[in-house]
């Protein structure tokens, strides 16, 4: 049998030799790491993470080893945070120490090498971008200014469902179409002629990036051998195509439209970003570039479609599975809107019960059960244990939100629990952090939740719903599929009927 230099066996032999030499030369440490399961040589604890639902696997391990747990994931150390007390200590009390982002190979490609808010490292750049997000792009005032846009696209969405009355439809696909339309309009201000191309790229990108961690992320010493991965090359090609589309849009806007120095209430997101490029109104030491703008636009499109579609689908399925809750949602929405032709954002602000349903859905089914990993910038101590510099910090928000000591009957979908315990999910209550918290919390919570609430309100106002194929609500398969987010393994298929019939 002959081997060429490209033979996988040579890669494996090289890696084993490299690993053994590195371990022999590695200085011994007296640090006391958090408890965790025993490790195996080379792979560490990877054998214990087998399975498709890591948030559930990690919860079982944390139940045994504690809410602050150490795992060895290949060559990398990972600290797993699994209860509210520990989340507050690590993410709040030591927030600056864990403010960096752990950037994997796929994320690096998709974000122009860590530009944008999600994967930028902590510092002046991230601070500036978060200010732009929270004060201008996605502020409460700005989100309200988008109501007309949301409602116009909602009319198209409702009309599309009306054309399928009595016929089965896949909810996730229908909802995603609306979300792509709204985020493109709020970014570009009008119907973008390249929208369909961008949507295809985003869908393909989300499929290719569905595996959260790749071999080269777990074993950085193997990165040189993964450079020519087919998947990574496909991602690079998609991002190059998206880059060309966005560059043309930016150049065309700068040629044909005056970039205003002062903000306007009705300006789109691209106008905000271009103003910061041209005039730097925040007075930061640097101006944002076209690369920054393209990275921001791409992350906005991804976050505003995939995560929000997850929220809507899980909320819909839980409401349908509970007839008493379903009746309250129907009655509330139809009582507030009465004979109106469309549901507005201001109507939704009055739908307190339906909004509690969305909140409870994000507790039971967070779109990201494991918050985007952070990376420790320096050693620090927690309860006598050392969280080491360079370690990944993984927060299992699903485990926190399933804690029976905080949430009675945690598996039960109970929107009314917030009447008794009115906590919110904006990051100040560490018992409920589906969108993260602190310096790395999601700056787009209000935009995403508003869109999810508006979609659900319109669907329950205009239509009655039944499960396709004659299934009963209690027969819906709730099996999860973990990838870029946590979605239903078997997409929810429903049959709409006009409400007045």
UniProtKB/Swiss-Prot annotation:
So which domain of life are we looking at?
Eukaryota
Task: Give the source species.
Answer: Alstonia scholaris (Dogbane)
Localization, UniProt: Membrane
Q: How does it sit in the membrane?
A: Single-pass membrane protein
One Pfam annotation, family name? p450
The reported effect of residue 109 to V is: Reduced activity
pH-activity dependence text: Optimum pH is 6-7.
Q: What does this protein do?
A: A cytochrome P450 monooxygenase involved in the biosynthesis of strychnos monoterpene indole alkaloids (MIAs) natural products, compounds with effects on glucose absorption. Catalyzes the conversion of geissoschizine to akuammicine.
Outcome when changing residue 372 to F/I/L: Reduced activity but acquired ability to convert geissoschizine to rhazimal, with a low efficiency
Q: In which pathway does it act?
A: Alkaloid biosynthesis
Q: Name one GO molecular function term.
A: heme binding
Does the record carry Oxidoreductase as a key word? Answer: yes
Q: Which GO terms describe its biological process?
A: indole alkaloid biosynthetic process
Family designation: Belongs to the cytochrome P450 family.
Q: Which reaction does it catalyse?
A: (19E)-geissoschizine + reduced [NADPH--hemoprotein reductase] + O2 = akuammicine + formate + oxidized [NADPH--hemoprotein reductase] + H2O + H(+)
Its activity depends on temperature as follows: Optimum temperature is 42 degrees Celsius.
Required co-factor? heme
Instruction: Give the stretches traversing the membrane.
Output: 1-21
Which keywords, in A-to-Z order, does the entry hold? Alkaloid metabolism, Heme, Iron, Membrane, Metal-binding, Monooxygenase, Oxidoreductase, Transmembrane, Transmembrane helix
What is this protein called in UniProt?
Geissoschizine oxidase
């Amino acid at each position: 049998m002959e081997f060429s230099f490209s033979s996988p066996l040579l890669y494996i032999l090289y890696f084993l030799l490299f690993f053994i030499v590195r371990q022999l030369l590695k200085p011994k440490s007296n640090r006391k790491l958090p408890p965790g399961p025993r490790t195996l040589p080379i792979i560490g604890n990877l054998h214990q993470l087998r399975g498709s639902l890591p948030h559930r696997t990690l919860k079982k391990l944390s139940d045994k080893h504690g809410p602050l747990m150490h795992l060895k994931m290949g060559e990398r150390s990972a600290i797993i945070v699994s209860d509210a007390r520990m989340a507050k200590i690590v993410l709040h009390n030591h927030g600056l120490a864990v403010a960096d982002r752990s950037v994997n190979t796929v994320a690096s490609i998709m974000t122009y090498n860590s530009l944008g808010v999600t994967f930028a490292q902590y510092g002046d750049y991230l601070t500036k971008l978060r200010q732009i997000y929270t004060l201008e792009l996605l502020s409460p005032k700005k989100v309200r200014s988008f109501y007309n846009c949301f409602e116009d696209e909602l009319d198209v969405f409702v009309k599309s469902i009306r054309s399928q009355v009595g016929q089965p439809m896949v909810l996730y696909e229908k909802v995603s179409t609306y979300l792509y339309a709204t985020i493109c309009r709020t970014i570009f201000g009008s119907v973008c002629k390249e929208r369909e191309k961008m949507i295809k790229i985003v869908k393909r990108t989300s499929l290719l990036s569905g595996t959260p961690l790749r071999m080269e992320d777990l074993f950085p010493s193997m990165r040189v051998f993964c450079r020519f991965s087919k998947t990574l090359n496909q991602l690079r090609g998609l991002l190059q195509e998206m880059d060309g589309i966005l560059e043309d849009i930016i150049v065309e806007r700068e040629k044909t439209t005056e970039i205003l120095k002062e903000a306007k209430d009705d300006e789109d997101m691209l106008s905000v970003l271009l103003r910061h490029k041209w005039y730097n109104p925040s007075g930061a030491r640097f101006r944002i570039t076209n690369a920054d703008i393209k990275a921001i636009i791409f992350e906005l499109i991804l976050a505003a479609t995939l995560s929000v579609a997850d929220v809507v689908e899980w909320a819909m399925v839980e409401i349908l599975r509970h007839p008493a809750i379903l009746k309250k949602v129907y009655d509330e929405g139809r009582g507030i809107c009465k004979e109106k032709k469309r549901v507005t954002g201001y109507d939704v602000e009055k739908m307190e019960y339906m909004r509690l349903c969305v909140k409870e859905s994000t507790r039971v089914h967070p779109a990201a059960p494991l918050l985007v990993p952070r990376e420790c910038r320096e050693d620090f101590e927690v309860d006598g244990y050392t969280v080491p510099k360079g370690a990944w910090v993984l927060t299992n928000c699903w485990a926190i939100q399933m804690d029976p000591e905080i949430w009675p009957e945690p598996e039960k979908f109970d929107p009314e629990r917030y009447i008794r315990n009115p906590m919110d999910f904006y990051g100040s209550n560490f018992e409920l952090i589906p969108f993260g918290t602190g310096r790395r919390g999601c700056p787009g919570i209000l935009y995403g939740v508003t869109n999810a609430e508006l979609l659900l309100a319109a669907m329950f106002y205009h239509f009655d719903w039944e499960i396709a194929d004659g299934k009963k609500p209690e027969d819906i398969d709730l099996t999860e599929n973990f990838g870029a987010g946590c979605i239903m393994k078997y997409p929810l298929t429903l049959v709409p009927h006009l409400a007045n019939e």
